[in-house]
A protein has these predicted regions:
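Single conserved hydrophobic/aromatic residue that forms the stacking wall/gate
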Residues: 291-307
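Hydrophobic alpha-helical transmembrane segments of integral membrane proteins
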Residues: 131-132, 261, 278-279
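Alpha-helical transmembrane segments that form the membrane-embedded catalytic/substrate-binding core
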Residues: 14, 175-176, 195-207, 241-244, ...
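Short helix-coil transition sites and intra-membrane helix breaks within transmembrane domains
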Residues: 167-170, 240-244
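Membrane-embedded alpha-helical bundles of polytopic integral membrane proteins
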Residues: 1-235
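Re-entrant/interfacial helical elements at transmembrane boundaries that shape
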Residues: 179-181, 252-255, 278, 282-283
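Interfacial helix-loop-helix junctions of multi-pass membrane proteins
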Residues: 247-263
Length: 307
């Protein structure tokens, strides 16, 4: 068996297993399982980020960063799911947590001698990891718990997480297929030589088409969205997914890494899997709750159009 076929089979097997677990967790409404899935992927992605820095010999407080990441992801689920805090309260919690992390990082230096002081880059690399992975990934929890529940108290936000993930992956699929078939004009060759403008527009077309298709197929499950929202969200999420993919490519190129890790055979690391979602999840923002409770999961772009 050739290396190319073996890579394809590994990628296919990893994709089937991963999507089976993810879809079952999302569609079943299993809240503890969903929390473990999101927190686990976020922490593994953060670990891969720090390991890439280690491979490049870039200093960082890896253990402190992982502890803060776990607190941020776990805290979001606890505050939203178990405490049932309102949007303003959870955002206050996150801001307070980030400020506390910053305070601890600087306070740590006060107990060291001049010879032991770590450079500013160490603190910057550590804190950047928190802003890059666990903080944006925690928006997935917000989508679940800030969406109105059913009269019986069951969450409905998992359907919008499914919408988010599928539209994001439609964007990735559109970029790959269009770029492979007709791609000729490089998008940003110094970052990712295989990315093309044709793939860029293909990604937007697929994400819009996928969003409209999902709203048409599941009108009752996605009752807070209509076709106009689907088009706008498709464009916003498609563009954000492209930027997220390029951002990770820039990070890997800076660290001299081909993949973020080997967590998923044939695919790469967890960070390779969630790179686009890190940028698309915050696009479905709670600011639209200022309209009324039935618009919780409509993106800020839709909110602005209604102003």
């Amino acid at each position: 068996m050739t290396d190319r076929k073996l890579t394809f089979l590994r990628r296919f097997a990893s994709t089937v297993v991963l999507w089976s677990i993810a879809l079952w967790t999302i569609l079943s409404g299993n809240e503890p399982g969903f929390m473990l899935l999101i927190s686990g992927l976020g922490l593994v992605g953060l670990l891969e980020y720090y390991l890439m820095l280690d491979a490049k010999k870039l200093p960082n407080f890896k253990m402190f960063g992982l502890f803060c990441g776990a607190l941020m992801l776990g805290g979001s689920f606890y505050m939203l799911g178990w405490r049932g805090l309102k949007p303003d309260a959870i955002y206050d919690f996150e801001i307070g947590a980030l400020l506390l992390f910053l305070l601890v990082v600087f306070a740590r230096q006060m107990f060291l001698t001049v010879q032991e002081l770590v450079p500013l880059e160490t603190m910057a690399f550590t804190l950047f990891g928190l802003f890059y992975v666990p903080w944006p990934f925690s928006f997935v929890a917000k989508i679940v718990y800030l969406t109105p529940r059913t009269a019986e108290g069951f969450v409905t936000g998992h359907w919008y997480v499914l919408f988010l993930v599928l539209v994001t992956k439609f964007s990735d699929m559109g970029a790959y297929l269009t770029g492979t078939l007709i791609g000729k004009h490089p998008l940003v060759p110094h970052i990712s030589p295989k990315k093309t403008w044709e793939g860029f527009f293909g990604a937007l077309a697929f994400s819009v088409g996928g969003g409209c298709g999902l709203v048409a197929l599941m009108p009752q499950k996605l009752s807070f969205l209509n076709q106009t929202h689907a088009v706008i969200l498709g464009l916003v999420l498609g563009f954000a997914a492209i930027v997220g993919d390029l951002a990770e490519s820039l990070l890997k190129r800076s660290c001299g890494a081909k993949d973020s890790g080997k967590f998923l055979p044939g695919i790469g690391g967890a960070l390779d899997l969630i790179d686009s979602i890190l940028f698309t999840a915050p696009m479905i923002d709670r600011k639209s709750t200022r309209l009324n409770s039935s618009h919780t999961v409509i993106s800020y772009a839709v909110f602005c159009l209604k102003k």
